Amino acid sequence: MELDGLHVAVLAGEGVEDLEYWVTVMRLREAGAKVSSVGLAPATVRGKNGLEVPVDVAVGDVNPDAVDGLVIPGGHMPDKLRRYAVVTDFVAAIHAAGKPIGIICHGGLIAISARIVAGCRSTGSLGIKDDLVNAGATWVDEPAFRDANLVWGRVVEDIPAFCRELVAALAAYRAAK
């Protein structure tokens, strides 16, 4: 499968957007990736719409060198996790290594706090447009696209396009390894 041998971390915490989390995780697993759910501490959390989401491991216990990519779903979770340096440092390290990072909906809030959006094209929930622009990104109103190693998705309705771009970016990363 196109992502065999890749390990992808997905950020999770209370209030994560259920579909952005679960559909993306399922698509990555379907493509052959090993997926780990990372958050502040191992636990079972509730998504924004009530689905259970397992947090497998604390983000501080994950070496960024041990993962091949990262996904930052939206919901209410990004506004909470962006406040923790352990989260933003993890995101910044993966970005600095040039590994693919998928960012959808409000996930851009964590990317802003990790200081990885300046100079790039971005999208997400319209509610964070000003935040992205103020952080130095260019706003693009498209369902999903790649800008270097960042894969952007707009909102829940754009999950299929986001997953296509994300899998393609991870497959390209795998081929270049």
Q: What residues fall within each predicted segment?
A:
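Extended, subdomain-level signal for the structured scaffold at the beginning of enzyme domains
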Residues: 1-97, 101, 109-119, 129-177
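Catalytic nucleophile serine of serine hydrolases
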Residues: 105
